[in-house]
Amino acid sequence: MKVNIGDKYIFHSENGMDYSIHIVNINDFRPDNERYGADVYDGNGNYAGDVMFFGDDFLQKCEKTAD
């Protein structure tokens, strides 16, 4: 999976809320499940308040967006 800084994804959660994920950091020295740092916004545009870390396993569940 090719991920770049600036890529954006949408996670469609089971509770019906869509979360916007903006990749802000990629660190190959982190564990596989924490490789990508991202800002996360809820469906109302509210920022989660901290960078969250994900791996390819999570991003494969998300939809990559064009913008």
Spans of model-derived segments:
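N-terminal cationic leader/targeting segments used for protein routing and processing
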Residues: 3-5, 26-28, 47, 62-65
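Short aromatic-glycine-enriched beta-strand elements
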Residues: 33-38
